[in-house]
Amino acid sequence: MSAALLSLVQWLSPAFPTGAFAYSHGLEWAISEGEVRDAASARRWIADVLAFGAGRTDAILLAHALRGHDPGALSDLARALAPAAERLRETEEQGAAFAATVAALTGRDLPPRPLPVALGQAAAPLGLPVAEVLALMLHAFAANLVSAAVRFVPLGQTEGQATLAALHPRIGEIAAESAEAPLDALGSAALRGDLAAMRHETQEVRIFKT
């Protein structure tokens, strides 16, 4: 395994200090309302977010950031695509924490940007295949949502791992498609997930930031 790939794996690890564990992407609301109540419904919910929501849009933004597209313009797109205040907070806070940590490790100048753009700027010099970077990012995103479901549904640890494993084929497909997608392909249709993010903003009892 190359040093470049190991660096990317480290950056996308749950141990990397982006605070990802504190964000449920609206999943907490879906669980509290009974829409996500077991491993099967968690898998469906997360698969839809990956294929039709932020998973896909972030993957396309990341692909273009890796290829050197204007990071300022990509950041504006990322912000515009956030369907709720908490989603915007989620991508900006994690992106800022990610950029600050990678900058401290590498000595590079990495300004705070939405997470997919920050990751793309950081990972571009690694020279890794675009689809491979996208797949690892999507896997990290899915793993974080599965972790939220394990804690809050709750699911058993083995159920959680089985849920994540079942998403692997779809992650590979989305990564391959997004690696070649133009910016004109940006858009989402995860309407229930977007509504969950909006409803979470006024949820009285919660343990996640989003």
Curated annotation (Swiss-Prot):
Main subcellular localisation: cytoplasm
Molecular function GO terms recorded: nickel cation binding
Transmembrane domains' residue ranges: none
Coiled coil stretches, renumbered: none
Pfam families: UreF (PF01730)
Subcellular location: Cytoplasm
Keywords assigned by UniProt, alphabetized: Chaperone, Cytoplasm, Nickel insertion
GO cellular component: cytoplasm
Subunit description: UreD, UreF and UreG form a complex that acts as a GTP-hydrolysis-dependent molecular chaperone, activating the urease apoprotein by helping to assemble the nickel containing metallocenter of UreC. The UreE protein probably delivers the nickel.
Free-text function comment from the UniProt entry: Required for maturation of urease via the functional incorporation of the urease nickel metallocenter.
Family membership: Belongs to the UreF family.
Protein name, as recorded: Urease accessory protein UreF
Protein's gene: ureF
